[in-house]
């Protein structure tokens, strides 16, 4: 709730369209995809948000993708990157067909993203160029591709984004296909800006929010604010993180 409010407030203040995404784990924690979707749409209404707001499923399996299509998400990521490529391709085609029938956009991934996301650990790899071309041919609306990026915090010995590989992917799939950069937290700003100039159109950020939220909440408690008056009220306890 607090994150959604903060994101919507920031988007409205900047007059910038925003995409709010839920992972499978986050949606389960919140009570399901319909609960998450309804909360966002109701907040958009009650907060008088005027900028476009997309509701996106992040790293969803086949079943999650179909459920989000049914409950009204406006954008779906089907992630079959852990499956044999032919199976990934087959399921992606089916998700695209079902989603496009309802005007919903689809993101798919080639080359697993490194790090951990909701308990799922990706080894991290550079996306295969030919597989990227085949995935785009399914009719997906945007493509997530491994270019050295990872989920979570980046290690000190991280070598940076593989820009040569990003350029090769962009040239292979064409300029009409937006590319997606997962693991945006921790990537230096200049690398993000360079990636955008080379075809990246969607940058996912999560860990950065989690760390900021945790830091502000911890400082509130360590300062003893939760012991002052009704400072223990979750609305006050979580406000600094928001």
Q: How should these model regions be labeled?
A:
Residues 1-26, 33-50, 59-176, 189-200, ...:
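Alpha/beta enzyme core
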Residues 181-185:
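Glycine-rich beta-strand-to-loop/alpha-helix junction loops that act as flexible
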Residues 188-242:
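C-terminal alpha-helical cap/extension of soluble enzyme domains
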């Amino acid at each position: 709730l607090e994150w959604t409010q903060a994101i919507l407030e920031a988007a409205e203040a900047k007059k910038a369209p925003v995409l709010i995404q839920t992972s499978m784990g986050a949606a389960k924690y919140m009570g399901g995809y319909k609960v998450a979707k309804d909360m966002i749409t109701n907040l958009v209404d009650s907060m008088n948000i005027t900028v476009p707001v997309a509701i996106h499923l992040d790293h969803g399996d086949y079943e999650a993708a179909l459920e989000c299509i049914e409950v009204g998400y406006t954008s779906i990521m089907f992630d079959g990157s852990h499956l044999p490529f032919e199976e990934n391709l087959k399921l992606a085609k089916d998700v695209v067909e079902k989603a496009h029938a309802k005007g919903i956009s689809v993101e798919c991934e080639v080359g697993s993203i490194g790090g951990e996301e909701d308990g799922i650990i990706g080894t991290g790899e550079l996306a295969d160029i030919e597989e990227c071309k085949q995935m785009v041919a399914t009719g997906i609306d945007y493509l997530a591709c491994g270019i050295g990026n990872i989920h979570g915090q980046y290690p000190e010995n991280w070598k940076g984004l593989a820009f040569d590989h990003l350029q090769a992917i962009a040239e292979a799939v064409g300029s009409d296909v937006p590319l997606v950069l997962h693991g945006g937290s921790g990537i230096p700003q200049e690398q993000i800006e360079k990636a955008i100039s080379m075809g990246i159109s969607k940058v996912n950020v999560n860990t950065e929010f989690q760390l900021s939220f945790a830091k502000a909440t911890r400082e509130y408690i360590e300062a003893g604010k939760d012991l002052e008056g009704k400072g223990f009220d979750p609305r006050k306890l979580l406000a600094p993180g928001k």
